[in-house]
Amino acid sequence: VKKLTSHNIQSGLYISLQSTSTKVLENIKRKNLKINKIGDLNDLAKENSMPLLTDLILGMPGETPQSWIKNIENVFKNDITNMDVYYLQLLVNAPMNVDQKEEYTLETFGAYDYFYETNVETIQKEIEAGVAESIQVIKSSNTMNHDELLDASIFSWFVLGTHCLGLSHLLAHYLHNTNGIKYTDFYLGLMDYLKEHDSNFNTWIDEYGAKDIRILRTYFGNIDIRHH
């Protein structure tokens, strides 16, 4: 990894956590990376001047709103700020789609903009012609309903923007190290403050969710994922 990074082929040491919940990792048969090893990996990355990167997948079987918040807390308290968040996708013939969809009541919708070089007009034409490509993306489960998943998504993108890509991680680290304040408590409190005092922030939340027209906006900007 160090050699790849030195030649700008790889940006750092990447570990795909997906979740830090023991229950979730058991459900997806992936209990092979214990959270207490992340600190060791991060130390190794720092010794070699490499950033540690990871990802979380929202909507996994058995994931709850509470365990999702804990996922983010575990990532941040292990000093990882390079994080991506993805929605769970159910692939054709994958074990989760075949064996676990009914068990965990995994409700999905067809997303047509999870591919490169797509736009709404092109997607609509392809749908009408019957040639559109789509992928099934999580909408709810028996442990996280649609509204809870949407709230978790909003919080995730909030911390990605402020902590991972912004400057608030400096304050969050300070409060955590000096006063023992959880990272997620800090960001939940910051969200509450902005909801009360910043109309632009509330506008962003409304636009992101757009619950009344059942459109879930994601990181693809002006392209909408439509529920079918």
What is each stretch, according to the model?
Residues V1-I181:
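A structural motif corresponding to the C-terminal lobe/cap of the Radical SAM core domain
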Residues H173, N177-H228:
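Terminal or standalone catalytic/regulatory effector modules within metabolic enzymes
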